[in-house]
């Protein structure tokens, strides 16, 4: 497939007269062009790429007069178009289910991490980004640039991670449900990681599983301990089943360690990196 052979109508529907409208519409039109002919868009011409969802992430505007509470998140879908049907023949209410799940799960995950997070509307309106895609589609609006409480979260790396993980979990659940398949969510990184070196030069690494309060399947089943020596990079890791790992250190050599959690959903981000040095006296 060559992306250069896409029709001009995909990205230039306004024929150069309105770049703003073309910019809004292009991603949806490209989705349809790529997915046309697949099982998700069988009645359209295209490249048969099996794209089954469309999601737009928008920063928001607005603030609460108290200056203390978050403006939160809202979601948007479009059901009143093409007789309420998508190209595959399924109802556009699948988009509403998707949008509602995105908003509700995001509010739950953010509230668990940061305290109360604003739950705003579920809009069923005529927006290009949810009208044009021929697969279930949604817009999620969040992180208002006019709201200081929201911007505190937006600039916090944990805020960005929590949002991204929440959206990942919703997409995984939604797709798995549509296919009637089980799912397992990737675990969170281990926490309370520590290393202690005894008088014989053995390093004892310990950590705790970090559980996802809103997703029981994210429990780790094993861990990977990564090790680096001296100025070298980390190795490919050692799989362990428990939350303790012992290793003999060579005198005078610096060691670096980090740990990742694993389950059937994948591997977590690594823990913080801890260093150990054995200098016998």
For the regions a protein language model found, what residue spans apply to each?
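Conserved small/polar residues in nucleotide/adenosyl-binding loops
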Residues: 1-5
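Second-shell loop/turn segments in exported
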Residues: 13-21, 42, 84-92, 150-157
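Active-site-adjacent mobile loop/cap segments within catalytic or ligand-binding domains
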Residues: 38, 59-84, 113-181
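Active-site-adjacent substrate-binding region
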Residues: 91-123
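Pro/Thr/Ser/Gly-rich low-complexity, intrinsically disordered linker/stalk tracts
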Residues: 173-217, 266-281
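Solvent-exposed loop/turn segments flanking beta-strands in beta-repeat/beta-sandwich domains
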Residues: 210-228, 234
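Short beta-strand segments within Ig-like beta-sandwich modules, predominantly Fibronectin type-III
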Residues: 235-242
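Beta-strand-rich modules
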Residues: 246-269
